[in-house]
Amino acid sequence: MPYPAALHIVPRGAARGSSTVVFVHGSLDRGESFRRVMRRLPELTTLAYDRRGYQGSRAGGIVGLGGHVDDLLCVADAAREDSGAPVVAVGHSLGGDVVVAAALASPHTFGAVGVYEPPMPWLGFRRAQTGTAGAWPPVSPDSGEEAERFFSRMVGPAAWSRLTDEGRAQRRADGPALVADLRSLHGEGPPFDVTQLEVPLVVGMGGPTTRPHHRRTVEWLGAHVSGAVVYEIEGAQHGAHLSHPDHFATLTRLVVDRVPTAAR
C-alpha cells in the first residue's frame, strides 16, 4: 500500500521485525525536524512526513485537523502493510493533537501513541495574559504575517532575524497551513474528548522552564486519561525534539514499550 502521494515522507531506514514509529510535526515545522531523534533509534523503523500544506507537502492543499487525521491514518496503514509490525505515532505540539484524534478515530491502527506538550486550549490552560508569553492575538488576515508572528513568538524575534531570506520565505509560504492549524484548535467546542482514548498513551513535557500552560495540560492528561504515563525532559522547553533528541528518543522508546504484548 503506497503512502499518500500528496505527502513528502522522511524515512530513516528499517529494522526488520521492529515496531514502526510515525512522527507527526507541529505547527510551522516539518518532518525533517525529527531527523536527529530518528538517528538515535536504529533499532526501530522510523519515518516522519511533512503534514499537508507544509514544506514538501504544500501541493496537497490546506486541510484542517480532520484532514491531517485522515493523512496520518493512511500513513500508518501503509507503514503497517510494509512491515507487518505494530505502528506507534508520536506527535510534537499540534502534531500531538493529530495523533490523539487519529487514535480516537481508529484505535486499532496504533499499538500505542505519544504526545509532547500538545496544545488543548479547551481544557482551560492558556498562555499567561502578561509578559512575553501573553495570550494569542487574533489570527492575522495575512498568512505570511501570521507565520512571522508565530515564529517570533515561539522561537524569538532574534531567531527570525537570523533566518536567511529563503528561510523566511519558506516559513511565510507555510502560513496558510499554520492558520488552518490555529483555527482547528480554536473552534466553538473541543475537537475531541481525549478522556475517551483507549490506546496506551505517553505524554511528554519539558522541565520547570517550559511554559506553564504546557505543563498544566500535560499534568491534566496524566491525571484524566486512563493509564497515561507522563515523561518529563528536565531542562527542555517546547522544542525538545530539537534541543534534547536523546531524551525525545527515550520518550519514543517508552511509547513502543507500551504496545501490548498481544499486538506485537
Task: Provide a role label for each language-model segment.
Residues G91-G95, V99:
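Gly/Ala-rich beta-loop-alpha elbow adjacent to hydrolase catalytic centers
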Residues G26-D29, S93, G207:
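Active-site glycine-rich loops that stabilize anionic/oxyanionic intermediates
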Residues M38-R39, T45-V88, T250:
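Active-site loop/oxyanion-hole signature of alpha/beta-hydrolase fold enzymes
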Residues Y3-R58:
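Conserved HGGG/HGGXW glycine-rich cap/lid loop of the alpha/beta-hydrolase fold
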Residues Q170-H224, V229-E232, A240, P245:
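Conserved serine/cysteine hydrolase catalytic core
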Residues V100-P141:
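Flexible "cap/lid" loop of the alpha/beta hydrolase fold
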